[in-house]
Structure formats: C-alpha cells, structure tokens
UniProtKB/Swiss-Prot annotation:
Pfam short name (any one): ATP-synt
GO CC annotations on file: plasma membrane; proton-transporting ATP synthase complex
Gene that this polypeptide is encoded by: atpG
SUPFAM superfamilies, alphabetized: ATP synthase (F1-ATPase), gamma subunit
Protein's recorded name: ATP synthase gamma chain
Keyword Cell membrane in annotation: yes
Bilayer disposition of the protein: Peripheral membrane protein
GO BP: any one term: proton motive force-driven plasma membrane ATP synthesis
C-alpha cells in the first residue's frame, strides 16, 4: 500500500511540473499574440496603398500583363502551404494541411498537376513522412516573419509563374494559411495569388460622376512590372503575419487546455492518494484490533 501512495505522489508532482511549463508557454504565447497583432496593424496601411495602386493600374488601363491575364488552359498549379515550425499549437498545422489536401484534390479533379511550396517545418515533416516531393521549402521564420522571407517566396513564385508550364512553370498559384479572426478563432483560408484578381481598393463611382483619367509614366507595362511583384510580396507577408498571429493564439489555447487538464489530474490523483492512505490506515487499525483480540482471548 505504501508503494501505491508513492506512485500517486510522484504523479501529482509530475502533473504540477507539467502545469508550470504549460502555464509559462501560455503566458509567452499571450505576449507574442499582442506583438503579432501590432505587426499586422502596422503593415496594413502599406498593404492597402499597394493594393490601391495595383487596382488603379489594372482597372483603368487596357494593357494585358502576364500576371493579370487568365491563361487559356491551366495545366500546372502551385500550392503554397503556410504551417508552423514548432508543435504544441493544437490543430494549427493540421487544419491548414487538411485544407491544402482538399484544394489539391479539387485541382486534380480539374486535370491540373500540383506543385508544392512549403513554409514551416511541420509542413516539411508532413510531406517527408508521406514521401512526397516539394519544389522549395522555407523554415525558421513562422513565429516572427521577416519581409526578406516574403520577398524570397514572392520572387520564387513570380519566376515560376512567368515560366511556361511546358518548361516546368505553373499557370496559377494558390496560398493556404490560417487567417487570424480573433484570439479564439483562426480559420484556414485559400487565396488564389496568381493570375492576379484585384478586387480590393477600387471604389465604386458615384452615380453620374466621371471616371478618373490616369496617365502613367513610364508606360503602363513598366508600371505593372514594378508594382505587381511588390503586391505579391505584400500579400505573402500579410499571409505570414496572419499565420504567425494564428499560431500564437492556437498555442495559447492549447497550453491553457493543457494547464486545465494538469489541474484536473492533480485533483484526481490527490483524491486517489487520500483514499489509498485512508484504506492503509483502516487496515492498520484492523490489524491492531485483531491482534489485541487475539491476545485477550489467549489469556
């Protein structure tokens, strides 16, 4: 019986130690969420300005550009998956990987060949475990995204997109990431990045008003050549920031759940230990009383 008490005591200590770790990780994630939200808010004006500029050029000009023109036939499509570098974040990575699998199934049903670009070690591990190939990978920056990484991804995607499919290029590009809705809610989202669909930033004209006339210097094609890569990079960076904030929120939620479960384990094992101690004391009393009765009857 004493051994059983020691087992319960050890389990209580183990649960308490685990709770200290998960509680610390919960607090760290909470502070990182605030920083991630601040970065999202700080990048929003730049993203809106770039979107308005691209919208103006694409809407008020009649120039066909490779990044905005729909191909006659889509043979190959790229999927960029934004997962995490670390675990202990609940269903954060699994949800975005599941969404990407559903997207891939849809694209394959349309007769398209899939090329994967992976961001985050969890996505890389997922593909390695299933022995599936990927075009390129980026790791080490999911928790604190850097614009240099977004630029690297954007450059690789644009280069792949302008290359003909017959030479290893792609006809369209999709990104899959977790959008940060709130601390309690993060939703996996799919966005078609290329060919460009500029639907933001174009204000509806007032009835009877004359549409603005734009003059572009240099030529419209040159303006698009300069603006569109910047637009792609800003969209990718925004996806990385959304994903980072979602990751911290998911980890905070997972660690809070782990801390609550540790509390429940401590309560359960404490009750079991008390019951075991009570049983041991009762048994000892019974043995003493039995021994006393035996001595009394022998006299």
């Amino acid at each position: 019986m004493g051994a059983q008490l020691r087992v319960y005591t050890q389990k209580i200590k183990s649960a308490q130690t685990t709770k200290k770790i998960t509680r610390a990780m919960e607090l760290i994630s909470a502070s990182r969420i605030q920083k991630a939200q601040q970065r999202m808010a700080a990048s929003a004006p730049y993203s809106r300005a770039v979107t308005r500029a691209v919208s103006a050029v694409a809407t008020f000009s009649n120039v066909d550009h490779i990044l905005t023109t729909e191909p006659e036939k889509v043979e190959r499509a790229a999927i960029v998956i934004f997962a995490s570098d670390r675990g202990l974040a609940g269903a954060f990575s699994s949800s975005v990987l599941k969404e990407s699998e559903q997207l891939a199934e849809l694209l394959r049903s349309q007769g398209k060949e899939i090329v994967y670009y992976l961001v985050g070690r969890k996505a890389v591990g997922y593909f390695k475990f299933r022995k599936r190939d990927s075009e390129r990978i980026w790791t080490g920056s999911t928790e604190k995204p850097e614009f240099e990484t977004a630029k690297s991804i954007g450059d690789a995607l644009v280069e792949k997109f302008v290359t003909p499919a017959s030479e290893g290029g792609v006809d369209e590009i999709h990104i899959v990431f977790n959008r940060f809705v709130s601390i309690a809610t993060q939703k996996p989202e799919v966005v078609r990045l290329l060919p460009l669909e500029v639907v933001e930033g174009v204000e509806a004209p007032v009835e009877g008003a004359v549409l603005p006339l734009y003059e572009f210097e240099p030529e419209v094609g040159d303006v698009l050549d300069a603006l569109l890569p910047v637009y792609i990079e800003s969209r990718i960076f925004n996806a990385m920031l959304q994903s980072a904030a979602s990751e911290h929120a998911a980890r905070q939620k997972a660690m809070k759940s782990a801390s609550d479960n540790a509390d429940k384990l401590v309560t359960t094992y404490t009750r079991l230990r008390n019951n075991a101690r009570q049983t041991e004391i009762t048994q000892q009393i019974s043995e003493i009383v039995g021994g006393a009765d035996a001595l009394a009857s022998s006299k």
